[in-house]
Every structure is written in structure tokens, then in C-alpha cells.
């Protein structure tokens, strides 16, 4: 839970930087400072690298960078909790891809209903109070696709390279995103105040959550960890309400609940399959 709280706090803080350096500049801060922190911790230069590992590392890092860039752009117009819920459909799709039990299709139905409740599009107004910006929705869905690819590619990278893939992937992600940040924010990225906030975002959104998740994975069953991770949309909605004063309708809260239920159910049935096997 600590990792979820710090991650959501970091993302809420990130949104406060958007008026000054944009979503692109904020993403650049997060990835550059996260790279420096992870490099200092893992010291990947101790490992012997080969050129044959470069293609999969580039795919891994590029996917990570684009995922962060799309998600932060989604946050410009979509409430935090809803953006997380939409993005969650990516890993949920990966988890359900190989589903065979009839119960697994219940989680698919719940996720589809939840997305249906989120997706009223068009201009928000009296006749359409739950409407969301379609561009923001597209960004969040794109981030979900990247998250799904990140999981699939990440499994291969982890098997081949291990923990050193994390700092190297983050380095590639930073290299991919930095041109966008410079293009939008320019010299504003060198503002010391914004840089310090960017460092705080990297700590809260990457370094601290990653450390806590690594500790949790060592001390919690994988199924329990996955179920706790499913609480992220709710924590995000709460953080958005407390920090950003974002208000969600009852329909949108129900949508978040359905997607969370689908994610938890998928984690539980996956755990049962592993026990059976």
C-alpha cells in the first residue's frame, strides 16, 4: 500500500508542473531523475553487455517512455483515478489473454461494463455531465496498450538480463522522451525550482514505489501483491480528490469499482491456476 500511496502522490505532484513545463517536460524530469537514481543504485556498468541485447532493451525502454508520456498527457484532461482505471485495461488484457475458465470471462464482462461507464465522450455540460475528453481517453488507452507491451517485453528482458534491465530500460525511456520535453518546455526545464519538484516526482513515482514493491514481492505471495496493486485506481481517485480537488460522478466511481473488481478477480483466478498447476 505504501508504494501505491507514494506513486499516486508523485503523480498528483506531477500534474502541478503541467502549467510550467507541460506533460512532456514533466515526463522528462521523471525519467531523467529516475534514471540517475536507478543507475546509482544498480550500477549496471559492472555487468558485461553485448550488442545482441540492445534490440530488446531498446524496445523495453521505448515502451516504458511512451507509456509515461501518454499517461501524463491523459492527465491533462482526464481525472487521475479514471486515467489509471483506463490504463489498467492493458495489463488486465494480458492477464486474461490466455483465459480458459468460464469464471475468467466474468472479469472480462466487468471490465467492459466499467469501460462503457467511463466512455461517455464529447463536451461536458448539463446534458452530458459524465463526458470525458476523447483525446485524453485515447492517450490513456494508448498508455494501457504500452503497459501491456511493457509486461510482455519485460518478462523476456527479465529472463535474459535480470534486474539490470530496469536502469538501462529507464535510460532508453529518458532518451526517447527528452526531445519531446525540450520541444515543449525548452529552457524552462533548467529552472531550479521545477527541477527540484521533478526530482521529488522521480522519488515518489519511481524510486520509492519500486523499492517498496521489491520488498513486497519478497514478503508477500504474488497473488496478494497483484490484488493490492488492483487498488491503484481507488488510491488514485482519492489522491486526485485530496490533492487536485478532482470530483468524480457516481457513474465514474462505479466504473472504477468494476475495473478494480475485474483486476482483483483476474489476480485471484490466476493464483488458483498456479496452485492447481
Name each region found by the language model:
Residues 1-2, 34-59, 100-106, 124-132, ...:
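Membrane-interface interhelical linkers
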Residues 25-35, 72-102, 143, 223-241:
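Specific alpha-helical transmembrane segments that line the substrate/conduction pathway
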Residues 31, 194, 230-277:
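C-terminal-most transmembrane helix of multi-pass membrane proteins
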Residues 1-25, 59-62, 66-70, 109-113, ...:
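Glycine-/small-residue-enriched transmembrane alpha-helix faces in small-molecule transporters
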Residues 20-66, 92-94, 110, 146-150, ...:
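Transmembrane alpha-helices of multi-pass small-molecule transport proteins
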Residues 29, 83-86, 153-174, 206-242:
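Helix-helix packing/entry segments at the starts of transmembrane helices
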Residues 6, 42-83, 115-118, 202-220:
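Specific transmembrane alpha-helical segments of multi-pass solute transporters/efflux pumps
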Residues 51-55, 84-87, 97-121, 130-136, ...:
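Loop-to-transmembrane alpha-helix entry segments
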Amino acid at each position: 500500500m505504501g508504494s501505491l500511496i507514494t506513486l499516486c502522490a508523485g503523480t498528483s505532484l506531477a500534474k502541478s508542473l503541467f502549467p510550467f513545463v507541460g506533460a512532456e517536460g514533466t515526463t522528462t524530469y521523471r525519467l531523467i531523475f529516475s534514471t540517475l537514481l536507478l543507475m546509482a543504485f544498480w550500477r549496471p556498468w559492472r555487468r558485461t553487455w553485448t550488442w545482441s541485447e540492445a534490440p530488446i532493451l531498446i524496445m523495453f525502454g521505448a515502451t516504458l517512455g511512451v507509456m509515461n508520456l501518454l499517461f501524463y498527457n491523459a492527465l491533462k484532461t482526464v481525472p487521475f483515478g479514471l486515467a489509471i482505471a483506463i490504463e489498467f485495461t492493458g495489463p488486465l488484457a494480458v492477464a486474461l489473454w490466455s483465459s480458459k475458465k468460464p469464471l475468467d470471462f466474468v472479469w472480462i464482462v466487468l471490465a467492459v461494463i466499467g469501460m462503457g461507464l467511463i466512455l461517455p465522450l464529447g463536451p461536458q455540460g448539463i446534458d452530458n455531465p459524465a463526458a470525458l475528453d476523447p483525446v485524453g481517453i485515447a492517450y490513456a488507452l494508448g498508455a494501457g496498450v504500452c503497459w501491456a507491451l511493457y509486461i510482455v517485453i519485460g518478462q523476456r528482458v527479465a529472463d535474459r538480463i535480470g534486474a539490470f534491465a530496469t536502469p538501462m530500460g529507464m535510460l532508453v525511456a529518458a532518451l526517447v522522451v527528452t526531445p519531446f520535453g525540450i520541444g515543449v518546455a525548452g529552457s524552462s526545464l533548467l529552472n531550479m525550482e521545477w527541477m527540484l519538484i521533478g526530482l521529488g516526482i522521480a522519488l515518489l513515482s519511481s524510486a520509492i514505489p519500486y523499492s517498496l514493491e521489491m520488498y513486497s514481492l519478497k514478503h508477500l505471495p504474488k497473488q496478494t501483491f497483484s490484488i493490492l496493486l488492483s487498488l491503484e485506481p481507488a488510491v488514485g481517485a482519492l489522491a486526485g480528490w485530496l490533492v487536485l480537488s478532482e470530483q468524480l460522478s457516481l457513474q465514474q466511481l462505479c466504473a472504477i469499482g468494476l475495473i478494480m473488481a475485474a483486476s482483483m478477480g483476474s489476480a485471484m483466478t490466476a493464483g488458483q491456476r498456479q496452485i492447481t498447476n
